[in-house]
């Protein structure tokens, strides 16, 4: 990348630290983001570096001592040039400032994850999809996601990303699945096809699971208790795998996969979002997975398994869509 960074993952980790923790806004932000960059989140879409800078400053006000610790960068070369990264971050911060997401300052400590899917060309990020675990944030501040969304709807500041808001950016690729990306994307597709039996067949019996709302869990039952209710809440929604990266040969790392996916349809079933309302809902999700050799009790010898799984979606954005429909 440059003399300052060893490679593309190092660049992604480094500019994140420079922008957020070193307060590298202004000129540094313009060096790292294209003037017309598009950033999509479950809460909406932002266009251009000035919007990125404004959103960054607003979060800095809410959580001024935030540390962003990069857990992994799963990446690939992009078709036609450039590179694409799926960057998983765990943040720790103190809520000492007020803001739209967090409300009046509470002094509470928060820990949460985000995954940013970024396309970079010519040393600048020009296309991005970002999912932050807002459900974990508001819960740690003493508010349930449904209550937060209800207040946002009542105040007239409820926003959510829907497909009709999207616009094409400079990146039109679908990733580089490889063996491990294809495997994980296939598993998610089968789960969303109600084939829940793939969990005990393909997840390790002692799998480590990190789910929305800051949930940490282990084992097949925990995976089933996350995926089944999510699908049940939107039983007829169209599931799409939007982007896949697989990596199997990075030194000192297990095989990994990053999958960005979406559910588009109506809230027609029971699940984590209460009684069915018929509300139109779009869910943007990003998952990371690590694979390993340990097979639990239901695998044929020699097979692989999902040992760790990270899933991110924004519960507050889903509730906004449901409650906005209810009026």
Q: What positions do the PLM features span?
A:
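C-terminal and inter-domain tail/linker signature
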Residues: 1-327
């Amino acid at each position: 990348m440059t003399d300052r960074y060893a490679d593309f993952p190092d660049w992604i980790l480094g500019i994140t630290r420079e922008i957020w923790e070193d307060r590298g806004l202004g000129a540094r932000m313009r060096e790292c983001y294209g003037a017309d960059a598009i950033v999509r989140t479950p809460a909406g879409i932002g266009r251009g570096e000035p919007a990125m800078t404004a959103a960054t400053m607003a979060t800095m006000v809410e959580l001024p001592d935030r540390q962003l610790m990069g857990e992994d960068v799963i990446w690939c070369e992009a078709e036609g040039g450039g590179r694409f990264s799926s960057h998983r971050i765990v943040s720790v911060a103190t809520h000492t400032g007020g803001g739209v997401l967090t409300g009046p300052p509470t002094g509470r400590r928060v820990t949460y994850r985000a995954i940013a899917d970024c396309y970079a060309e010519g040393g600048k990020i020009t296309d991005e999809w970002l999912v932050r675990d807002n459900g974990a944030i508001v819960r740690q501040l003493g508010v349930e996601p449904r209550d937060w969304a209800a207040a946002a709807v009542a105040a007239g500041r409820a926003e959510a990303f829907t497909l009709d808001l999207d616009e094409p950016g400079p990146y039109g690729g679908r990733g580089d699945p490889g063996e491990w990306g294809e495997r994980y994307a296939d598993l998610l597709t089968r789960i969303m096809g109600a084939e829940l039996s793939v969990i005990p067949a393909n997840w390790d019996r002692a799998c480590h699971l990190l789910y929305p709302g800051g949930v940490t869990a282990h084992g097949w039952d925990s995976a089933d208790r996350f995926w089944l209710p999510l699908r049940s809440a939107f039983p007829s929604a169209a599931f799409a795998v939007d982007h896949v990266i697989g990596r199997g040969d990075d030194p000192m790392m297990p095989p990994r996969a990053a999958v960005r996916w979406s559910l588009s349809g109506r809230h027609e079933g029971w699940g984590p979002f209460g009684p069915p309302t018929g509300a139109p809902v779009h869910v943007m999700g990003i998952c990371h997975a690590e694979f390993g050799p340990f097979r639990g009790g239901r695998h044929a010898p020699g097979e692989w398994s999902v040992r760790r799984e990270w899933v991110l979606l924004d519960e507050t954005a889903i509730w906004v869509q449901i409650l906005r429909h209810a009026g």
